[in-house]
């Protein structure tokens, strides 16, 4: 049986564009390398603006998972903490609401610009890999009928 292809949506923040644009390039090339199809890329102003775009993608039957890409850079106030924590919370809520993976490829909070630059490839590729693995594994869960012994899904 041939495995169904994995269809991704990507939501990328424009804020800190020098970082997020490189993250998008890394994510697109890594998805291609892993034979996943990126169906839609949506650019939003900032990470705090991601949830609505994520929700719109999750509503589509042709999207199996959503990858988020962004960079929340530390400032002089606690704004970065609020943005990062609220966005992460909503991402989890949307994933469980729609029963589809939404992965967190958002650098920060607390990261300096230099630290964010160092983490571009790591965060982008890990978010893509996590989305693909979660789709594959949740498909295996969906195929389970009855379990008499311990099943390890990896």
UniProtKB/Swiss-Prot annotation:
Catalytic residue list: 79 (proton donor)
EC numbers for this chain: 2.5.1.78
Entry-linked PANTHER family: 6,7-DIMETHYL-8-RIBITYLLUMAZINE SYNTHASE, 6,7-DIMETHYL-8-RIBITYLLUMAZINE SYNTHASE DMRL SYNTHASE LUMAZINE SYNTHASE
GO biological process: riboflavin biosynthetic process
Listed pathway(s): Cofactor biosynthesis; riboflavin biosynthesis; riboflavin from 2-hydroxy-3-oxobutyl phosphate and 5-amino-6-(D-ribitylamino)uracil: step 1/2
Highest taxon of source: Archaea
Name listed for the protein in its UniProt record: 6,7-dimethyl-8-ribityllumazine synthase
Organism of origin: Saccharolobus islandicus (strain L.S.2.15 / Lassen #1)
GO CC, alphabetical: riboflavin synthase complex
Binding residues for 5-amino-6-(D-ribitylamino)uracil: 15, 47-49, 71-73, 104
Lineage, broadest ranks: Archaea, Thermoproteota, Thermoprotei, Sulfolobales, Sulfolobaceae
Keywords of the record: Riboflavin biosynthesis, Transferase
GO molecular function, a single term: 6,7-dimethyl-8-ribityllumazine synthase activity
The protein's role, per its UniProt record: Catalyzes the formation of 6,7-dimethyl-8-ribityllumazine by condensation of 5-amino-6-(D-ribitylamino)uracil with 3,4-dihydroxy-2-butanone 4-phosphate. This is the penultimate step in the biosynthesis of riboflavin.
Similarity remark: Belongs to the DMRL synthase family.
Listed InterPro entries: LS, LS/RS, LS/RS_sf
């Amino acid at each position: 049986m041939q495995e169904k292809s994995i269809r991704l949506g990507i939501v990328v923040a424009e804020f800190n564009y020098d970082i997020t644009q490189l993250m998008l390039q890394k994510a697109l090339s890594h998805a291609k390398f892993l034979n996943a199809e990126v169906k839609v890329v949506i650019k939003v102003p900032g990470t705090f603006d991601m949830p609505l775009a994520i929700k719109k993608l999750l509503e589509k039957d042709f999207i199996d998972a959503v990858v988020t890409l962004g960079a929340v850079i530390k400032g002089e106030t606690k704004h970065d903490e609020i943005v990062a924590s609220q966005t992460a919370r909503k991402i989890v809520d949307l994933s469980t609401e729609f029963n589809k993976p939404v992965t967190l490829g958002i650098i920060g909070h607390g990261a300096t610009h230099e630290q964010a630059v160092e983490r571009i490839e790591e965060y982008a590729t890990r978010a893509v890999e996590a989305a693909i693995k979660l789709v594959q594994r949740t498909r295996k869960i969906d195929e389970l009928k009855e379990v008499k012994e311990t099943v390890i899904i990896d």
